[in-house]
Amino acid sequence: VPVSHGKIVDNSRIARVIPTIEYLLEREAKIILLSHFGRPKGQYDPSLSLAPIVDALNKFLPKDRPAKFCVDCIGDNAKEAVAKLRSGEVLLLENLRFYAGEESNDEDFAKELAMLGDIYINDTFSCSHRSHASISALPKFLPAGIGVLFQEELSNVEANLMKPERPFAA
């Protein structure tokens, strides 16, 4: 999500994951959102916090179910925030890249994330090539599936590869 001076410049990436969130909300799921932002190199950087994303996210959510934000993505703060989460609520965890384990694909980091949920849904086809803990290691520890956006993007790739318009250039 593009941010300038702490303000979101373009919320289209947030809008694109809303169908998956709505699908889960309709089923009264407890939704824990994981994401990354910038390149903090495993260190906390307040300018790369996901906190401003919550306000943008809430513009798309029902007014009576605003998303909550947790100042961490693992540890006691995250466990406590998840424990307080009720069915049909959304929780955004802090930037995964504040921990070196995210980009190093650390399985212990992934296990800590896995302890917070029951099912893993990947809705980021565009990031799925990365060998990061939240993408590569986490699905080893939870049943996994794909979200609405991922399915749409996968369908587009399949359509273009299986039935490309001619002439076709790669």
Regions found by a protein language model. Give the residues of each.
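Active-site loop-to-helix "anion-binding N-cap" substructures in soluble metabolic enzymes
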Residues: V1-A170
